[in-house]
């Protein structure tokens, strides 16, 4: 190597390979043994043109490979090359012909023109078209190339560089060789199997859709695994994280590349957004979430029962309850201390009346629960409706104490109205809890229990509850008998059924649309270093950073933080859960209860006019066209006007009358067109029951219930 010409050729070789010797040390050894090197060639070559990459000796080096490898043809190219990093794998993935030279000043085209038999732009089945003899002839010809020939070839190269290159995608087939396919602009070829940050999605769908994109199917040695190297050297504008299949494209075609990448990214995101229900179960230790609402007449014992359940399940510690007991005693409200767990504000504690819907959270061994404690007073029925719209199961608390049951159930009492409103708001399962059974006037009497449940059972069936969906049980909210543990057989030998929590833990679960389009009616709002909305997710799931639309204003918002039932931050929340979301993009004063957060792809519909089927349950006079009242639809409260009565429905058959009725009165079922003054978020009852049922109220009483049949 002391010869200066040898030194010069070595330097040039180093410059052309530019650091690839470290990756491929085996290339350098044949170089020193080459008998073909012609120093005159090296002197004739002018490096100042910036074409240091063109090295005839480089081809001789590859020629050396050919001669070596023709001896191995008996074992097949593929096996031999696969074991040694392979011609195609090695060069394609580790700075090979196409990618490496493409990045280094277009050496690729030169190689292509000289090796016409080996053309990566055509889809050959493996190596059949690769002819080493022809290759060697061409190499020997190319060594005697003059400078003029070289310049001519260079001009051709420039021209070919300006042509739009065909975008390539690597497909790893089940065989050990890798084929370069001409990728068309179909999404399938560029479709990523799943992004690196993909949430645990159901993988069988992806696998069946594109088996060739599975990396596992190719037994490639780790050192030459295709993805990382290609990601280093590919110049195309492809996002690394979302495309594990390396796509090879020349710089002249960034537009088509980015277009297909966008669709591929969208597909990846869609797959990422799918959530496996099994994974969700594992996440919460197999516990699903149930919202329960305590409802019933004022003083039936709803808050006391809720407070006692929280104490019995360990959600409220003993010290807190003892503190409430002392405070209640000082205030002369000794028997109310358990209700103070639920009724937190001063006014509620002084009057012993719940005013707003109290919320609390507890957990058993099998499930997670949110208690919604509805106010029993008729002044606060609208709050109760908002609470019922978020509940899965209704617990109707009735007092067995003499006089109290009658007050609650007879005219003017709230027991009937609450049961009706719960049914209208989609609470299809109702547990009738006969409370205060330990009272001296009752003393666990079976006769009194049956008297209470029989009357109420007839009424509940009349408003549409199935026999199987009505469950009765005797309890004492104050002593806790029948809440967590079963009632003591000494006190109550005639009841052998489950306790309240035992029944809740073992009842059938609701069908949740975890992968449906996201929908969450806003039930409350607040300002807490930003805008916070709360509500129950009716469909779909949400993650931090998700972009949503707030309807009906069509305001785009971003989810910054998710708070779950226990007020802790969470990364995701699923259908059926009660959550608070901190959102960006809207001011607190610009939204109100009844607005709906929805996914941008499937936004909830907004209407001012719709057709509905209405059953009139309580109406002192009659109603006709132009009648106005208040409508409660999910969490929205709007004034509504009857624009047109279209049909009367016959009792029993539900057949429509041909003539529109002139008026409607109590007990009638009608189809009418209603109009609201402001746009309201609604869906038909058939598509989304939660957003398609409503209650009509007038002068403090519920006059009708209805479901939307058509949006106009």
Curated annotation (Swiss-Prot):
GO biological process per UniProt: nuclear-transcribed mRNA catabolic process, deadenylation-dependent decay
Pfam families: GTP-eEF1A_C, GTP_EFTU, GTP_EFTU_D2
Lipid metabolism as UniProt keyword: no
Family annotation (PROSITE patterns): G_TR_1, G_TR_2
Cross-referenced CDD domains: EF1_alpha, eRF3_C_III, eRF3_II
GO MF entry, a single one: translation release factor activity
Record region (G1): 296-303
Region G4: start-end pairs: 435-438
Region (Disordered) location: 1-64, 76-115, 132-162, 184-256
Compositional bias segments (type: Polar residues): 1-23
Lineage top rank: taxon: Eukaryota
Stretches the record annotates as Charged: 144-282
Residues annotated for GTP binding in this entry: 296-303, 373-377, 435-438
Record field: compositional bias (Low complexity): 24-35, 48-64, 132-141, 190-201, 218-256
Region (G2): 352-356
Residue ranges constituting the tr-type G domain according to the UniProt record: 287-512
Cell compartments where the protein resides: Cytoplasm
Region (G3): 373-376
Chain positions found as Phosphothreonine: 370
Function: Involved in translation termination. Stimulates the activity of ERF1. Binds guanine nucleotides.
Protein name: Eukaryotic peptide chain release factor GTP-binding subunit
């Amino acid at each position: 190597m002391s010869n200066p010409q040898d030194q010069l050729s070595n330097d040039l070789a180093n410059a052309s390979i530019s650091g690839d010797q470290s990756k491929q040390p085996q290339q350098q050894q044949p170089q020193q043994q080459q008998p073909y090197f012609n120093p005159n060639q090296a002197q004739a070559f002018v490096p100042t043109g910036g074409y240091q990459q063109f090295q005839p000796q480089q081809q001789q080096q590859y020629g050396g490979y050919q001669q070596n490898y023709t001896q191995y043809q008996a074992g097949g190219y593929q096996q031999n090359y696969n074991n040694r990093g392979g011609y195609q794998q090695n060069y394609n993935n580790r700075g090979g012909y196409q990618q490496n030279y493409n990045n280094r000043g277009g050496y690729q085209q030169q190689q292509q023109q000289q090796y016409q038999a080996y053309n990566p732009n055509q889809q050959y089945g493996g190596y059949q078209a690769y002819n080493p003899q022809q290759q060697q002839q061409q190499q020997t010809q190319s060594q005697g190339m003059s400078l003029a020939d070289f310049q001519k070839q260079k001009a051709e190269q420039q021209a070919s560089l300006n042509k739009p290159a065909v975008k390539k995608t690597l497909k790893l087939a089940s065989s050990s060789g890798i084929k370069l396919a001409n990728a068309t602009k179909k999404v399938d070829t560029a479709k990523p199997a799943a992004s690196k940050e993909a949430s645990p999605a159901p993988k069988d769908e992806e696998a069946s859709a594109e088996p060739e994109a599975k990396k596992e199917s190719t037994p490639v040695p780790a050192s030459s695994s295709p993805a990382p190297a290609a990601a280093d050297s590919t110049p195309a504008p492809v996002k690394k994280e979302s495309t594990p299949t390396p796509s090879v494209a020349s710089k002249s075609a960034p537009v088509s590349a980015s277009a297909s990448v966008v669709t591929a990214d969208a597909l990846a995101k869609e797959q990422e957004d799918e959530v496996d229900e099994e994974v969700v179960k594992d996440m919460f230790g197999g516990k699903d979430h149930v919202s329960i609402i305590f409802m019933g007449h004022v003083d039936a014992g709803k808050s006391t029962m809720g407070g006692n359940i929280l104490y019995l399940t360990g959600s409220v510690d003993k010290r807190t309850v003892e503190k409430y007991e002392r405070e209640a005693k000082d205030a002369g409200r000794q028997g109310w201390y358990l209700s103070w767990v639920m009724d937190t504000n001063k006014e509620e504690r002084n009057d012993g009346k719940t005013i707003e819907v109290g919320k609390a959270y507890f957990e058993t061994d099998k499930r997670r629960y949110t208690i919604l404690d509805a106010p029993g007073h008729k002044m606060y029925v609208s709050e109760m409706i908002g609470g019922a719209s978020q509940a899965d199961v209704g617990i109707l608390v009735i007092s067995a104490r003499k006089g109290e049951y009658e007050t609650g159930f007879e005219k003017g009492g709230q027991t009937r109205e609450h049961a009706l409103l719960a049914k209208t708001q989609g609470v299809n399962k109702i547990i009738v809890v006969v409370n205060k059974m330990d009272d001296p006037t009752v003393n666990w009497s079976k006769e009194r229990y049956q008297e209470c449940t029989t009357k109420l059972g007839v009424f509940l069936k009349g408003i549409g509850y199935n026999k199987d969906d009505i469950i009765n049980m005797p309890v004492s909210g104050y002593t806790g008998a029948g809440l967590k543990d079963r009632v003591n057989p000494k006190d109550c030998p005639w009841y052998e059924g489950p306790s309240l929590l035992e029944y809740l833990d073992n009842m059938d679960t609701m069908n949740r649309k975890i992968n449906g389009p996201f929908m969450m009616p806003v039930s409350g709002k607040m300002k807490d270093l930003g805008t916070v909305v709360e509500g129950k997710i009716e469909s779909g799931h949400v993650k931090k950073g998700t972009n949503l639309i707030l309807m009906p204003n069509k305001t785009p918002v971003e989810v910054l933080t998710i708070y779950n039932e226990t007020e802790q931050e969470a990364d995701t929340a699923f259908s059926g859960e009660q959550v608070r979301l901190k959102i960006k993009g809207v001011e607190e004063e610009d939204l109100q209860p009844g607005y709906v957060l929805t996914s941008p792809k499937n936004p909830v519909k907004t209407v001012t006019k719709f057709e509905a089927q209405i059953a009139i349950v309580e109406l002192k006079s009659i109603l006709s066209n132009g009648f106005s009242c208040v409508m409660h639809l999910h969490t929205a409260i709007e004034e509504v006007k009857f624009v047109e009565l279209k049909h009367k429905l016959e009792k029993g058959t539900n057949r429509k009358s041909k003539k529109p009725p002139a008026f409607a009165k109590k007990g009638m079922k009608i189809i009418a067109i209603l109009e609201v003054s402001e746009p309201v978020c609604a869906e038909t009852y058939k598509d989304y029951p939660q957003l398609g049922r409503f209650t009509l109220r007038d002068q403090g009483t519920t006059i009708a219930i209805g479901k939307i049949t058509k949006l106009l």
